[in-house]
Amino acid sequence: MFLGTYTPRLDDKGRLTLPAKFRDDLAGGLMVTKGQDHSLAVYPKEEFTALARRAAAASRSNPQARAFVRALAAGTDEQRPDAQGRITLSADHRRYANLSRDCVVIGSVDFLEIWDKQAWESYLAEHEEDYAQARDESLGGIF
């Protein structure tokens, strides 16, 4: 399970060091794709493969679903962390997420999100008041 907030820095070669506690879960390979709200989503390879296969199976007769699968496949990069736990983020991914040197990696239960630090702080400030309402509406009192 991916939980927590971490603040790694992007180096001059576009490499980001993944939080140490997640490296074992991602050692078998990972997939970096464009996420929501101009973040990047990082999935374990097996998890992403299962999601992509389900999306592809549903898309054969639906033009919107086919377009989504095309964009998903074209915007995804397979990575394997190096010995220091770093992955190289493509220029396209860095541009999409508007990544500066200071980044934030957050756990989103079954995947990670990579954000530009300033964008993450703005997102939190903008949505802070909505958190309690969203929790109550979407989780119905579980928490």
UniProtKB/Swiss-Prot annotation:
GO cellular component: cytoplasm; nucleoid
UniProt-listed InterPro entries: MraZ, MraZ_C, MraZ_dom, MraZ_N, MraZ_sf, SpoVT-AbrB_dom, SpoVT-AbrB_sf
Main location, first listed in the record: cytoplasm
Pfam family, one: MraZ
One biological process term in Gene Ontology: negative regulation of DNA-templated transcription initiation
CDD domains with a match to the protein in the record: MraZ_C, MraZ_N
Entries under Gene3D superfamilies matching the protein: Transcriptional regulator MraZ domain
One MF term in the entry's GO annotations: DNA-binding transcription factor activity
Domain SpoVT-AbrB: from-to ranges: 5-47, 76-119
Subcellular location: Cytoplasm, Nucleoid
Keyword line: Cytoplasm, DNA-binding, Repeat, Transcription, Transcription regulation
Subunit structure comment from the entry: Forms oligomers.
Family per similarity comment: Belongs to the MraZ family.
Protein name stated in the entry: Transcriptional regulator MraZ
Species of provenance: Nocardia farcinica (strain IFM 10152)
